[in-house]
């Protein structure tokens, strides 16, 4: 802000805090951010059933906070802390186009089922059909599985492996891929029975392993695929982790305790990525027979960031003066 012909950075931050809702009332702003996320999606994207993935992103928080702060969630140690601001997103990949469709703030007391329901409700509001849903091990519990059994689309979840020899670890056996059913009891959720697909693949140096590797997936709903096909389908989920890495490249940093301000920065960053993909596929593409040729090398993310900065400078004016303060 100091380089622009406009208000100072501290003035902007103060005014922004005055406009944003208090941390306890983020629902309205969350809805506005979700509308902004999908404001420039291709029309054809919203008319077809899409493969979707949901996941959590943990952003480390190193500041002081109240013990009962709902915006701070505990997690595995990362970047020197076990305290995080946590967000959940729902994401799709269609013809190599990656778009974030929904975003929600995850509070400390919330279960993963709560946030999954919120994300799916957002997508239903867009009238987007889900062809297939991919979830990681963080969503593997009986409450989520029971809820997904009531949904009209199939879901693939990475199975959590527990036990030394028994439990789900006993399913990782044999040298051939296979399908079985598994009944899991829980002390807090109802007992659930579900299909498990075990895919066997030779690592050949991948996954930092050698020899035979086994991958187990829970399949909820009707899905007539071989376990190896399930394995390859599930690899689509890793696009969502790519979106988190890119989001962190364009996300504004802050030391503020305000969870609303931090949610705003995450929402703006994801919107910038959605716009980047939209511009590449609509403006940086060469028509040809069949699928269009998108010239990704002409608009890398670094250049997109610089373009946005140039637009801000053109609109706000760039300050070329250096003011030397007088001696006291």
Residue spans for each PLM region:
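An anionic, glycine-rich sequence signature occurring as long contiguous blocks
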Residues: 151-248, 305
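A short, flexible helix-boundary coil/loop motif
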Residues: 3, 172-204, 211, 249, ...
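Short, conserved catalytic/metal-binding motifs centered on acidic residues
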Residues: 1-2, 11-12, 48-62, 90, ...
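Domain-level cores of phosphate- or acyl-group-handling catalytic modules
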Residues: 109-167
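Electropositive, glycine- and tryptophan-enriched low-complexity nucleic-acid-binding patches
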Residues: 72-129, 212-215
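Short, solvent-exposed helix-loop connector elements
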Residues: 225-234, 246-266, 283-286
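Short, motif-level signal for alpha-helix interfacial/capping segments enriched in acidic residues
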Residues: 26-40, 113-118, 217-223
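Active-site-proximal, Lys/Arg-enriched surface segment
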Residues: 10, 14-95
